Amino acid sequence: RRRMQIICQDPFGSLNPRMPVRDIIGEGLLALGVTDRKIRDKRVEDSLEIVGLRRDYTRRYPHEFSGGQRQRIGIARALALGPDLVVCDEPVSALDVSIQSQVLNLLLDLRRDFNLTYLFISHNLSVVQYFSDRVGVMYLGKLAEEGDVEQLYRDPRHPYTVALLSAIPNADPRRRKKRLVLKGDVPSPAAPPSGCRFHTRCWLREKLGNPERCVTEEPMLRPIGEGGHRTACHFAEEVSDTVVDSVVATQSVLETAVAEPA
């Protein structure tokens, strides 16, 4: 368990308001048998320093910090145990855009310095592109497509992925792109549709004349293209290059980090 830690989405709800930072970060160390208070406090202070916070913050409470600082405390809590894998559950979605870039760049620096592996969960595809090496796109709890980040963003081969990428805002006002607006309501994950889970909202199926195979046969992930690119679509080859080119546009993520932590 020590080798796997998590950074929670909500920096306001994931920290116990009744506990000082020293105990919030040190709780995991205590659970793993680090009973010496001096050793534990030293590890806590080191963890705070690593994420860009002052060592003397250990006696403060969560309400004394900003959202960005609270998320740094959450990151320090995860790092204190020396994990190999860190699950990042939407770690910047609750933060202001100006703070998001700081936290993302911090996570990238920590990955490099401590040789970490991240499982990064996000709905922001611009952030995913900036942050990830490989990407898996899920729909109703199942993988729809996965692959190298550059390959998948350049040549998506699942209709759902194409629709998601079409929704990324384009910062260039001179460039026009077509957005694929999905029809219908999202089905319940507890009672997903038969066959392909996306068939009730799939623009490609409608374009192909609503083939019955999408309803009766669940598609399995299969190789398509290079770099371990796989997709779960019976008609992935029909996702034409013209459609992909007209909808795929990526948005640059703020990469400048302010010197002082938020």
Predicted regions and their residues:
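Interfacial catalytic loop of ABC nucleotide-binding domains
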Residues: 2, 10, 42, 59-61, ...
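ABC-type ATPase nucleotide-binding domains, specifically the catalytic core motifs of the NBD
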Residues: 19-39, 52, 147
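Conserved ABC ATPase "signature" region
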Residues: 39-56, 165-166
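Conserved ABC ATPase signature
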Residues: 61-65, 69
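A short, proline-enriched helix->beta-strand linker immediately N-terminal to the Walker B motif
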Residues: 80-84
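P-loop NTP-binding/switch modules centered on Walker-like glycine-rich loops
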Residues: 87, 91, 95, 99-178
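Short catalytic/signature loops enriched in Gly
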Residues: 148-260
